[in-house]
């Protein structure tokens, strides 16, 4: 397990609401909460940047964090991330913000403290480019979209 440094930017975290935590021993994501000043109605088609009240510092360049949607919000209510996935670099130290987009047909109320996204730590391998004239042959080659069949 990796120790993740965190700064609490909203005093309600740790008092009214717990620090992000894993829901079960097998959970991959830590739940992030909407640390809004008041409940907010997200209209259909609207995107809103929501503070989490928390900043983190990963510190290890071999790791990054992803902010991902919560499956229930997307499936049941059409609430997904406006940027689809948020990437948190290992040297970022600012507040974690969640871009929420209502792709549904009805307005959705985001309550103060509601779990709106999840944070997942992932390994990172940094690459450098090696410029070549040609690639070694592979079975796929340059086959792109639909190369393996229609269904």
From Swiss-Prot:
Gene3D superfamilies: 2.70.40.10
SUPFAM superfamilies: dUTPase-like (SSF51283)
Catalytic reactions of this protein: dUTP + H2O = dUMP + diphosphate + H(+)
Recorded GO MF terms: dUTP diphosphatase activity; magnesium ion binding
Binding-site positions, substrate: 70-72, 83, 87-89, 97
Keywords per UniProt: Hydrolase, Magnesium, Metal-binding, Nucleotide metabolism
Cofactor(s) of this protein: Mg(2+)
Pathway(s) served: Pyrimidine metabolism; dUMP biosynthesis; dUMP from dCTP (dUTP route): step 2/2
Catalytic activity, EC: 3.6.1.23
Family classification: Belongs to the dUTPase family.
Protein name: Deoxyuridine 5'-triphosphate nucleotidohydrolase
Source lineage: Bacteria, Pseudomonadati, Pseudomonadota, Gammaproteobacteria, Pseudomonadales
Gene: dut
